[in-house]
């Protein structure tokens, strides 16, 4: 069983993180939800605790004796932040550690996936573009948002990807983090990608096989 820390930013897409938490739990992950203060304005603490089966904290000082941010950082096999708001991207890019989520991300050695969601103008703003580049340079995986209907009548890039897509990406992040990072930086919309893990055998003659213990395509 893998331990997944699900960070939730304070955006309207926070409701999608409820389904993501359930999907991750259903496939066998131990999920710990860490919402920001703003996220609790969209989805309350009891909902997160019911979906994850674990207590939910937002501040470093909520559970001082257990040093929660270090405990989560060390136990996590992966951290996924969905939605990652423009504010969260800026704080993480700057190395801020002013709540439980940012301190956990800063302290972990586990792979981190950020799934941004915001208005198109905010996503394309030069400051956000620079922050995303900084985060990727620091080794965090930033998955580009989907394109479609946004809050209100606007449409464009900035939608949080479907929860099932993020859940599949989390599994990839845990098993093959390098591949996940490469895929996240490419526009794969409308393309089919096949990932094959495990041994392969290739016939080179009627009597000989070329065998590989592991393969990745």
Roles of regions detected by a PLM:
Residues 46, 50-91:
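Glycine-rich oxoanion-binding loops at beta->alpha junctions
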Residues 111-146, 157-169:
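Short, glycine-/small-residue-rich phosphate/pyrophosphate-handling segment
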């Amino acid at each position: 069983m893998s331990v997944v820390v699900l960070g939730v930013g304070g955006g309207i897409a926070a409701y999608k993180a409820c389904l993501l938490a359930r999907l991750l739990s259903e496939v066998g992950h131990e999920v710990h939800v860490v919402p920001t203060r703003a996220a609790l304005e969209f989805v309350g603490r009891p909902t997160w605790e019911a979906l994850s089966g674990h207590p939910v904290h937002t501040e470093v000082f909520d559970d001082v004796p257990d040093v929660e941010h270090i405990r989560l950082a060390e136990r996590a096999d992966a951290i996924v932040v969905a939605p990652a708001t423009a504010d969260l991207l800026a704080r993480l890019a700057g190395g801020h550690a002013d709540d439980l989520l940012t301190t956990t991300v800063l302290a972990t050695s586990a792979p981190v996936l950020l799934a941004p969601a915001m208005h198109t103008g905010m996503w394309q703003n030069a400051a956000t573009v620079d922050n995303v580049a900084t985060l990727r340079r620091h080794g965090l995986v930033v998955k580009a948002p989907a394109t479609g209907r946004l809050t209100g009548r606007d449409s464009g890039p900035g939608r949080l990807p479907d929860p099932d897509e993020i859940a599949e990406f989390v599994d990839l992040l845990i098993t093959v983090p390098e591949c996940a990072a490469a895929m996240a930086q490419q526009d794969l919309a409308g393309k089919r990608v096949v990932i094959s893990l495990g041994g392969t055998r290739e016939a080179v003659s009627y009597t000989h096989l070329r065998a590989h213990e592991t393969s990745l395509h």
